[in-house]
Amino acid sequence: MKKGLFISIFMLAVTYVGVLLTGNGAIAAEPIVIGIASSLGLGTGQQSMDAIKMVVEEINSRGGITVGSSKRPLKVETVDLRDAEPGVPVTEALLGMEKLIIGKKAYAILVGPYRSEALLASMDLIAKHKVLMLLSIAMTPEMENKIQKDYESYKYVFRLCINSKNFMEYMAGLYTYIGSEFKFKRVYVLNEDSGFSRAAVNPLIANYFEKPDSGWTVMGHRTFPIGATDYTTGLMDAQMKGAQALLMLTSMPQGINLVKQWKSMKISALMAGYTGLLTTEEAWKELGGGFGGAMDLIMEMGNGIGVKEIPRSLEFLDKYVKRYGPWPKGGAMPHGIAPAYESMYILQEAIEKAGTLDPDAVVKEIEKTDRMGAMGRIRFDKNHQVVYGVDPQKASVAVVIQWRDDGQRVIVFPESIAKGKIELPAGLKTGR
């Protein structure tokens, strides 16, 4: 009886050890769980998730991440926070993140909340659990302020995409270039009545256009309700007042009507700003053309566009298209996807340099990041925001494209990577 019991226990032990062994006899390493949390039902969230999964597949094909003397595979767990959907409370998004951290034991959260309100609230959750979070969508500069005020609590949070301050700097830089290049002085502002547009346009007017040294005079400012389809009154007013440039800021699908009406009415003023709809290579075909001359901002290089000056932007696009098919997917905005892609590489490098999964040690290595990536040079400032500028050898970059009447898009800003000059609409002369 005792002999039989001993044999049974021995066989159970052998079976247990066998479960832990891989095919080559090595102990199977426990995977590192990478959590992807955002509004994954939207195109931007979905594409960001796809980009990260592509990197995870690549890393796992090489055996995983090297942690000290061992290799650890990666496992992706996802949660759709739905925080970009109307009526979804921030508390629901936080609950989803907490389930990922506690239930799925996520080591790090990538992409992160879509809305700035959800991001700021989630930082306390990240601090509580000491989980790394590398952001690539939400843009509020208040993230950096929180890190500056309480570094020890919030040091686990980093952002790779541009923030709203960077956004305004690019708009100001573009208009400074336009003013210098064409000797223009008169601008008219057209924006939708959304939180995004108000948060961007009001500081831009107050802190740039209305400053004497900007060289610009604001001839008028029209705010249209969300969902508006007729923008003719604002366009006619801009024409009547002699505006030489139209700053447009929209993020809703109806914004395409503003650009098309500008074109069909033959308004003799440059159309330059942000819609998010006119940036992809497929936009001309999908939207029926009719917006040649319009300029739009792509918030980070690599989001559907690449240049030889930034080799990894072309490499990323090539890999993405081979893996998932033509860009874009699901109407994604030109924002966040390339930063999400780079976030997984940055996390991998930091873990391998630290030689441990201790979050404090990995934070120190992320802070030292200095790599050439899909957006240009990637470095973090002291408050964990990636540095953006106009020279990809020194910083990550956003780009402004202008559509030509033959349906081709051309990078016109910043000058360091421009592929053509800004073309003026018919009837608009320089320096008038």
Question: Where would I find each of the regions flagged by the language model?
Answer:
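Short, low-complexity disordered leader/linker segments with a strong preference
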Residues: 1-33, 101, 128, 429-432
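Beta-alpha junction/loop-to-helix N-cap segments that form part of ligand/metal-binding clefts
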Residues: 29-31, 44-50, 65-148, 160, ...
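Extracytoplasmic "Venus flytrap"
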Residues: 35-53, 79-86, 90, 190-199, ...
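Short, polar/charged alpha-helical segment
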Residues: 45-67, 203-209
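Extracytoplasmic ligand/sensor domains, especially the bilobed periplasmic-binding protein
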Residues: 106-220, 270-297
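Hydrophobic alpha-helical
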Residues: 115-128, 204, 229-236, 241-265, ...
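Extracellular/periplasmic periplasmic-binding protein-like sensory domains
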Residues: 164, 262-341, 352, 415-419, ...
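Segments of small-molecule ligand-sensing domains
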Residues: 323-337, 348-412, 417
